Amino acid sequence: MVKTQRVVITPGEPAGIGPDLIVQLAQREWPVELVVCADATLLTDRAAMLGLPLTLRPYSPNSPAQPQTAGTLTLLPVVLRESVTAGQLAVENGHYVVETLARACDGCLNGEFAALITGPVHKGVINDAGIPFTGHTEFFEERSQAKKVVMMLATEELRVALATTHLPLRDIADAITPALLHEVIAILHHDLRTKFGIAEPRILVCGLNPHAGEGGHMGTEEIDTIIPVLNELREQGMKLNGPLPADTLFQPKYLDNADAVLAMYHDQGLPVLKYQGFGRGVNITLGLPFIRTSVDHGTALELAGRGKADVGSFITALNLAIKMIVNTQ
C-alpha cells in the first residue's frame, strides 16, 4: 500500500482570497493530508463568512498521515499579528505571511511534508512591513539554499519555463549568459524527468530578439550565446529545438512535439499561457529540494469573503503536486 503523504499549504495574504480558497478546498476529500500553515481564527471566520463547514484538526507530526475528509483541515498554527478584515491590508501581517512561508518551507526541508502549495501573497505589504521580498520563488531559493531555481507555469496543455524572471526589460540581454542557460536548461530537463515522469523531455527554446535575431540583423544574442549552448547540450543527448521566434513558436506544429517551452523572459512566455488558461494555470518552482506549486493569480482583495473566488487554480495546483509526489516515489 502506498503511504499517505502530507502536503503543506500556505493561504498567503490573509485579507485576500487565499483563506477563502483554502476553505473551498476543504469541501472535498483528498488522498493526502492537507496541513494548513495559518491562523485558526482566520480560517474559521472566513468559513463562517462563506457559509461553509470547517473543522480544524491539530497537526500531529508523530502520527501517520491520513487522507483528508471533506469539511476538515489539519492546522499547523501561526498567529496573526493584527486582526483581519477581508479586503483590507494590514502592514504588520506581512510578518505573519513570511512566518507561514518559512515554517512550511522548513517542514519540507526536514521531511515533514511531501509538497508545498502556496496561495497568493501581496508583495507590497510584505515590503511595507520592512521585509525585502521579491516573490515566493526567490524566498524559497534562498531559504533552501538551492543553487538555482527555475520558474515554470503550466496548464494541462502547456508548460512554459523562464530563463529570467522579475527583471526590468533593459537588463535581460545582459542576464542571458551561457552559464545561466546551461543551469536553467539542466534544471528544466532534470525536473521534467524526475518530477513529471517524462523520460526524454523535448524542449522548445525561444530566441531573445524578434525573429530570433534574423541571422544577426536584429541582435546577436542567438548567435553569440543561445545557439552555442543548445549545440553543447544536444551533444549531451538533450532534445532541444531552437532558438525559435517567440511569435511563431506557440502553435500546434511546434507545441504538439514538445513537453515544455523555455522563454527568455517573463512577458515573452507567460502572456500566451495566461491567455490560454488563466484561472487554470499553476506556478511551479523547479530546482528546489522539494515540490512547490502555486496558484497563478493574485490576492483579489475585492473578492475576499464574498464567496466569489474561483478555486480552480488551487485545485489544479494541488492535483499537480499530488501527481509529482507519485512520480518521485
Swiss-Prot record:
One annotated GO molecular function: NAD binding
EC numbers, comma separated: 1.1.1.262
Main location per the UniProt record: cytoplasm
Cofactor(s) required for function per UniProt: Zn(2+); Mg(2+); Co(2+)
The keyword Nucleotide-binding is annotated on this UniProt entry: no
Keyword hit for Magnesium: yes
Reactions that this protein is recorded to catalyse: 4-(phosphooxy)-L-threonine + NAD(+) = 3-amino-2-oxopropyl phosphate + CO2 + NADH
GO cellular component: cytoplasm
Pfam families from the UniProt entry: PdxA
Any one Gene Ontology BP term: pyridoxine biosynthetic process
Biological or metabolic pathway of the protein: Cofactor biosynthesis; pyridoxine 5'-phosphate biosynthesis; pyridoxine 5'-phosphate from D-erythrose 4-phosphate: step 4/5
Keyword field: Cobalt, Cytoplasm, Magnesium, Metal-binding, NAD, NADP, Oxidoreductase, Pyridoxine biosynthesis, Zinc
Residues that coordinate or bind substrate: H136, T137, K274, N283, R292
Subcellular location: Cytoplasm
Record-linked InterPro entries: PdxA, PdxA_fam
Binding site for a divalent metal cation: H166, H211, H266
Cofactor binding annotation: Binds 1 divalent metal cation per subunit. Can use ions such as Zn(2+), Mg(2+) or Co(2+).
Subunit structure: Homodimer.
Note: The active site is located at the dimer interface.
Family in the record: Belongs to the PdxA family.
Function description: Catalyzes the NAD(P)-dependent oxidation of 4-(phosphooxy)-L-threonine (HTP) into 2-amino-3-oxo-4-(phosphooxy)butyric acid which spontaneously decarboxylates to form 3-amino-2-oxopropyl phosphate (AHAP).
Protein name: 4-hydroxythreonine-4-phosphate dehydrogenase
Protein source organism: Escherichia coli O81 (strain ED1a)
Gene that encodes it: pdxA
